[in-house]
Regions:
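Bacterial N-terminal signal peptides that target proteins for export
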Residues: 1-8
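Bacterial N-terminal signal peptides
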Residues: 8-16
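C-terminal motif of bacterial Sec signal peptides marking the signal peptidase cleavage site
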Residues: 18-20
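C-terminal partner/receptor-binding element of secreted or periplasmic proteins
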Residues: 30-37, 42, 119-160
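Short beta-strand-centered aromatic/proline hotspots
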Residues: 106-115
């Protein structure tokens, strides 16, 4: 009986230690972002999004899926926060839409080099087009989406 009780105590202690270690090493959720726009224009190293929305969507991946709507203002303010900020390590993004000129789908891989700046009717980013992307000097799109991949472990909904 004494051995059985000792075993149970040791097992419970081990489980408790594993749980507390797991909590200490658990990383913050990595949030990805989506901005929708009525129109988009990619011209040189600038991306202009025309949108009525003052918010963007945020979500996490499996296994603990979460989602939220956050203001562009709060997201912009967080651009240079943390040791691994977007300012220090610009995020990859994909711009998806339909080319206004020929109605063909367009997918352009970019890097967002700056926080968005509010302009008449929307927002403007400084961007860098990635290798293999459509390098036309000007691309105009109708309804568009920009998916922003967050590799940062410091930019989180919890910190906004």
């Amino acid at each position: 009986m004494r051995k059985c009780i000792t075993f149970i105590i040791l097992a419970l202690t081990a489980c408790s230690l594993m749980t507390s270690c797991d909590k200490q090493t658990k990383k913050a959720d990595a949030w990805d972002f989506v901005i929708t726009a009525k129109e988009a224009e990619l011209k040189g190293d600038q991306l202009t999004l025309i949108t009525n929305s003052e918010h963007l969507f945020a979500f996490t991946d499996r296994p603990n899926r979460k989602f939220a709507s956050i203001s562009m203002e709060d997201w912009t303010k967080s651009w240079n926060k943390g040791s691994d900020s977007f300012e220090k390590d610009p995020p990859n993004a994909v711009l998806v839409g339909t080319n206004s000129a020929d109605e063909k789908e367009v997918l352009v891989e970019i890097e967002l080099m700056s926080a968005p700046v509010k302009v008449a009717g929307g927002y403007r980013f400084q961007i860098k087009r990635m290798t293999g992307s459509d390098h036309q000097s000007v691309v105009r799109m109708g309804r568009s989406f920009i998916y922003i991949d967050n590799e940062s472990d410091t930019l989180s909904i919890d910190t906004l």
